[in-house]
């Protein structure tokens, strides 16, 4: 059965007619604002090389763990979905993999994935019928053709999407060659990097030792000495800032921070290098490094992002065969009040530091995060993240944080995605949900419509620019 | 004051007129579907013997901890409510107990109990005025009379309620005589059992040793040896399957699982039998047994249900005098991410195993359970349970699980009740709430109405049949 | 830009027209009921001395941590906001501080603070334009003038606000002189005290030793002996009851209770006095004292309130400079099920005891608190507290507790404030939110409108009077 694909202009607005009218007006003032994407995981090589994307499966399905984890949960093997394993590329025929997705679209009913996909199918590729078993081949063929045309190259899409700024995320061991190539090419698209040092901080990461060696090579520092190790961080941060970075990012299992003496920090570092360390040692080192990163941020001005609370690689069998980031990362209960205290005791009242905190544990929104951000000058709240980057998730974020932290201790939207084509769809969802939330406040006479308009624009555009220091004169020439 | 009793046809639908219209249409397509009740606690003797229920108090009040715990919380002694104690039957006159309920109906405003009761009073008994102090006797008399008529016998009600299948829950030490008698009687009602081995697994259960003896007698196994004990489980599972069982059920204090070596499991079992064991030993044994049950399910195909997180018998004084299941079980914070890992590491990627997980800790819906069920092939989410089997509770379940797990990693509704007459009321509430939730998605243009119709039918009928393997050809002849 | 200030008559009601009509009717029956304020932190000296309040900054901003913490979170130093430090009064000019607030009102969009302020500005001071940078001086001047007039003295406002009863909160070491003076003055306003013994119970409180000495002086007891210490509590409780107290209040870091033997309690007390104690000792002592307080309540009839779960003075630097209660108290995850068990095992089934429990951890509403209060005769649920005393917070409280605990295990509203002028605003918000919640139940046909009217009046007026024993014949002459 073939069904029409329609992106209703009122989608995601509250159903009540009066509230919807207000939402429509608020959304009208933000829908065409440029996209600021200050945190995400697109591949800089796309913009450096500007090569065409290969086909629908390799564009949409194989890299998107939101999609293939859902199919996997219903018993479809990853090998049939185009997902590469440690042994090499997937044995699946891309067209067959695409058909598998197409015939299981009912699994995504009520999920953000279906909204994002339909947005892309309708807005970017112009489809007017839904993806289904019947239309799988039509989709696969038309998408394949389109991708060969110049209008669907990464840079062309970047411009078409009205992206004012896009940040990627790299490891300190990345030589930033794609960012350099982009700049050398003279292309005007503003793509910057962000400093994510987890591989050289997390001693439990499978690549820790190899990353550390590479870290030493790139910086010429003795990274087996504590002072050399810290100096290497300073150098790579500076190098990242030359490629436009205004932020760092830290994806630790918990939000723990520590504030050890120099001697204790040094001894701990030596212990980690000896490889004779416990999980508690590794945790304490990650905790200490957040405080070290904060100290460096006070010097160089980089905004810190903390993304804690994911139990990575939960599925042992899958990890052994397919490696990381395969949809098997599961959120855990996360404490902030005790975890952040050492860092806050040291730097919480600094006005020159900015730390953006995220959570996968919504129970902390009203209980911990809004009260912390509503008090400490250094703290801001990142938007609803990952599993919660969804209509209901975003609504809960606003409902549970606004009354204590207000809107102005939040930082606007992050798409946080490597699904490049979904970026406009994701920002559009955020703008619609914020418009709907503000519209409810207006309809309940808790906020004037004038104030709501101003706030809507701030959430969509001004707050991310300010929070990520994107409108400040850059400290390094290259960031302009 | 006497007030009319009205069951409004639009009850529980969202108030917004447009959304309500959609909900009405969706509900229309499911309201008359047969009831599938794959998990509950009705007494098989009712259907085996088909004896009349005694009176209103003994039918509604004395066995329903939802009702008497609320009266108890306001200072009414259980002895006045018909609730039996360990010393014997209640000293209360049933009519007096009924009057006590009737004159306190305001306590139930806004609770599901009042909706369930009113549904039964109106739909099953035809009352058109509300229960109150003034109408207490009228109710007591009319219900008493009705219960003597053939139309109110258990089997007649079963048929009138349009129940396609009803599962009861029995201990391994139950000889299943009522199920056997039912089958022998030639009655066509499909009532099956389910295997709930807690009394022979939980060494802290007050009947553990006695249950174990009985377990040995029934199976002829040496249940004091580890292999004999496991073999006894296999034999009782097979016997339960002969009485139609398609599932097991496990009501542990936590969701902990373990995967011990054979030697360690055996040693632990011996320790428990020595009675010289710690609470941690008992917990580890329950954890190990979940993994053992999963292993057996891979062989015999029974679906596992895990109902963790209730702190049983919290009120020490009440437990001493009245025993278990007296409304004093309190939910606790429950971890799933670490707890389930040992079992999932062993069997999480099996396609021949199905584990349905429940929770009393709603904070785990979006954080842990939806991400786990949205990834692992073996996991499905049971519906909102116990305290959360209520309009707001069900809404939160859908709002917090759908965006990550979708609808198709859930299993439809369980009434989980021993209040037989409330079964249609409870399924009706679930169908109305799901219709309302789907209607909101349609009204917000997040789902087409066609897809919503299909999903509504799946939630009400197809998913429970599939999840509990009720439409599969049975592996044992008796289950047909 | 100057904008009109309007308090819309329908504010906070649900947007749906039909539901709003019902809410309007329900609110109509409660809006003019007298205010019962059984728990709060106003200063009894205001009513004893009836001196005029000084100016807008000292009335609104400097004492209100909701306001200045938000400004502080955005980088405004407390010294610029009129907040006194340990070193003495604030160096800020009150008018300058007021301008700082006025020009940052956008920070409060969507927060209850903005609703409360606007209510006071509009209803109490008659402003018809919003506070902003442009109107800061106008506001400061007009408020300053008004405060000098007799109509704005504390007692006149008390009467204008239609307050039937107001409870303040004092330490056992307070000599209650202001309460005595009030009574001696012949003023008819009913202002009573409440017994908050934290400073003589919490050995980690910075004033513990000094408070203990004062406690001994006031009572003439040897408070370094366990029996003398307990006797001193009994005496101060009696003295508080003479000043109208009907309740005690306990603000511990957790909800832990204990039930030690006499010998163990005595030994623990000696250890605390030796000053050679661990945090765990201090915690155990607080836990034991809750049980001791319950035992005394059984004798003297005082209602217990437990307000647990705040991590006090989280910001070490701020605490060192400005002291306690400066907006740096952060909620923590709070367990009730295990924490309350020792007290409940001892006294949970008493009908002569009443314990009102509060939480800052909303995840405990549906999981722990509603099930506990829906079972134990001694337990009632306090209203949404502190960070959750807000429109969304109150809604969540009702949505998450009503289905299990009903309305009648809750105790109506507490304003819990030291912002005297905001008391009518806060009660008005609570009445509107409850009207809106009840209206939704009526609109969804879950409650009749007659029952909703009765319930609305109970929540606004009857339940607080009953729960705090304000309509019982007093046991002491002074309480009448």
Curated annotation (Swiss-Prot), chains A, B, C:
This is Uronate isomerase. It holds the Pfam family UxaC. Keywords: Isomerase. Belongs to the metallo-dependent hydrolases superfamily. Uronate isomerase family. The keyword Isomerase applies. GO terms for biological process: D-galacturonate catabolic process; D-glucuronate catabolic process. Gene3D superfamilies: Metal-dependent hydrolases, uronate isomerase, domain 2, chain A. It catalyses: D-glucuronate = D-fructuronate; aldehydo-D-galacturonate = keto-D-tagaturonate. It is an enzyme of class 5 (isomerase). One of its GO terms (molecular function) is glucuronate isomerase activity. It comes from the Bacteria. Its EC number is 5.3.1.12.
